[in-house]
Amino acid sequence: MSITKNAPREGAEEVAATALGVAAARAAETRRQRPLIVDPFAQLFVDAAGQDLWSMVASGAAHDELASADPALAAVMQTSLGHIASRTKFFDEFVLAAADAGIRQVVSLGAGLDTRAWRLSWPDAVTVYELEQPNVLEFKLATLRDNGATPAANYVDVPVDLHRCWPRSLCLAGFDPAAPTAWLVEGLLPFLSVAAQDLLFGDVHKLSVPGSWLAAEALSSEFLKPTTVARQRARIRRMRVTAATLAGLSNVTELWDLAEGRSDVADWLRGRGWHASVLTAERLLARYHRSAPVELGDATPPSLYVTARLSAESSLDA
């Protein structure tokens, strides 16, 4: 049975708005004349959710309405959509490079409605493990199944709360801690506490052998500044009142943990034998020709993109 926006899937209202928002952004990118990424499944999630807000974002109608009333605010929205597209492309390229280098197990922590296991061209014998809240995975897999989608890699879903003992669930699902792994941490860290972030990377490190790769969207010091958060919240409020199609837009910053003392991800990894490099979101968007207008430079999210590889001389007990 095909799912349409006129028949929302049972339980769709429980799927995190953040996951649906990112799917809508990928659907919008897929519609572009020269898309950075093509995700033929993103629109399926938008339709299955049956929420006009995300349908309007995916179709471009929300942006067009905003542009007619406030072009500068529309440019902010377009930068946000461009950031999600660039982020998706970054992780796509990373994970395919890891697979081409011989890594045969991929773990996505907080996978949301990502569809890499379905839409990327994988080498033989790659297994993709996705860890996410049970309701999100149930919605995703049911929507894909009802639309005849099949994974392009060996796929294993691991329904789990990442605040709990997820390593045990991952290993019980077939993960091999003795084999090199490509780890993906995309769009997750703002929702974790300072302690939970350290625990997450501690568990990743314990489960990694030399030759493992990791990519993470990390938070710069600017990301957590009260002025940065206040500016983003103000823009979301303006979008709500400027465009009727965006009236239901949730303020994702209210879900972030803004406590001080968060570890620098790259430094944390380097201290445990990983060779890490960092790319700012501004440079990432420039790489893919999606930079914000000069006069709206602060519209680019102050994220950091960390890539790392675990060296042979690393102590796994560090």
Curated annotation (Swiss-Prot):
Keywords: Methyltransferase, S-adenosyl-L-methionine, Transferase. S-adenosyl-L-methionine binds at residues 132, 161-162. One of its GO terms (molecular function) is methyltransferase activity. One of its GO terms (biological process) is methylation. Its EC number is 2.1.1.-. The keyword tRNA processing does not apply. InterPro entries: Ppm1/Ppm2/Tcmp, SAM-dependent_MTases_sf, SAM_mthyl_Trfase_ML2640-like. Belongs to the UPF0677 family. Exhibits S-adenosyl-L-methionine-dependent methyltransferase activity. This is Putative S-adenosyl-L-methionine-dependent methyltransferase MMAR_1595.
